[in-house]
Each structure stands twice: as C-alpha cells, then as structure tokens.
Amino acid sequence: MSDAICHLITDNGSYRPEATLSLRSLAERLGDRVGQKIEAVSLLHSTKISPDKLGGTPAEIFEPFIKKKREEGIHRFHVTPMFFGPSAAILEYMPQRVEALRPKWPELEVRIAPCVVDADDSDDTRMAQILVDQILETRNARSFKSPAVALVDHGAPRIKVTEVRNHLARQVRQLLSESEFPQVTACSMERRDGDDYAFNEPLLEKVIGIEGFCNEVIVSMLFASPGRHAGPGGDVAKICEEAAEDHPQLQWQMTELVAGHDGIIDILAERFQQGLHSDPVGWTGEIPEWQAP
C-alpha cells in the first residue's frame, strides 16, 4: 500500500461558483503555510457547478474524489474541515460514508482534523478576533458611531454548533468596547421548525429592527465563503433589506466573510497538524503512525 497521504480541506458544498473558488483559495493558502498540496473538496453539491464558472476545472466532492484517488493508489486521506463547529456533516455524514466504503476498501484510512473553533478552550480568542477585525473595518468604512452588532450564523440542527456561535459572541462582546458597541447579540439566519430547534433563536429577522438594533447595525458574518446565504444578494442580505423597508432609520452593513481574513489560515494550520495525530475514522487494531510534514 502506498504511504502517500492526500490532504483535503472540506466545506459543506454549494451550487454557487464563488464558494468553490473561495475553498480553492483557502486550500492554496493553507498549503503554502504547511508545505503540502491541499485539495479543495466539498462534501456535496458543488459538482453541479459548471466548470466554465470555475476556470475550466470541475469542482470535487468527497466520495467520488477519494474513489478516484484510489485508482491512483492513494488510500490515506487527511481532512481539515472548514466548519466552525462540530457539524453533523463532519461528525456523522463523512464517517458514515467512510464506513460504508471500507468493506470493499479495507486499506481506506481517513483522519479528520478538529473543526475551527473549540468552544471548550476559552483562552483561544483567535476566531473571535477575526470577527472583531471585520467588525471594526466595517464600522470605519461606514463611519458608524455606536453600532449594534448582530453576529449571525446559518442555524444548525445540532446544539453544539449553536454553542460555538454563542461562545464566539461572548468573546466578541469582551473584545469590543461597550461604549463603542453597546449591543452584541448572537442570532441565526434560519432554523428548522419545532421546539427541538429553538436553541437557534433568536433569528436575525427578529433582531434587526428591534430596539437597540434599529439604527446603526453591523451584521457580523459567521460564514466562511459567499454562496446562496452569504455575500451580496444572499439570504442574509435579503433579510436585512426587508427589515430596512419596515424601519427607514435602519443603517446596516454586513462584514466581510471569514475566508478572506489571513487569521483563518493560522487556525487551519494548527488544526491540520492536530489532524495528523488524530485516530483514523472507525479504525480497529494498531493505529498507524503518520509522519508530520
């Protein structure tokens, strides 16, 4: 069996070319940092994008990609997730697909690095500092005096992911001056119906326009890359535009997205190294040692 390791950075995937191009940029920048070739591979969806919109190179998704690599004699894969928190996509879907492949591919070895944010490590404020940098840049660009901050994520079916959002909001609140930013609130873009998913509340549409969030508002985007939800014309922007129609005094601005900040590479590079020393998914018996690059 080949000892070669294929390194991937993975997101959930999107039908929008901007998301794949952003993931490719992250892969290149992370590869430069760690001295390895990093492949940009989404979990799902992205192969629906026309290659013409991706510089002629088709997008890759996880299962077909690793099967293709098998034909090249590659059986070892190391995944760095571009997920802020412990999403089911990484903790459940990907391991399930690996286990489903293993009966006919016993050599398959997949190690998954930790997600971007460890909510149990209160001393690590790097992700919060990225958000703060982008909030300050937005405040200065718009010449806001004392804006409120709505820190918004997509919304998730797993409470552990929402706890990451809330953890970051607490850190951002501590890092910002209260006199300059009187309100910092965590919210979600959307949620599933039912009481089981009420932990996603409040929704952005219920925050923007209420007292304290009806004048100057910065929408801090806990999104990695542009797509259907984030970026110009996305769902978050539409929610804000609709709120502005009902509240003429509302001045709002979204921050830039996380993937564009150099600080995310510092975090991903650390997670990359941690992933090299993680246990392979579903591995039984003696765990093979990988050499760090």
How should each PLM-predicted stretch be described?
Residues M1-P293:
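Extended amphipathic ligand-handling, pore-lining, and cofactor/metal-binding catalytic surfaces
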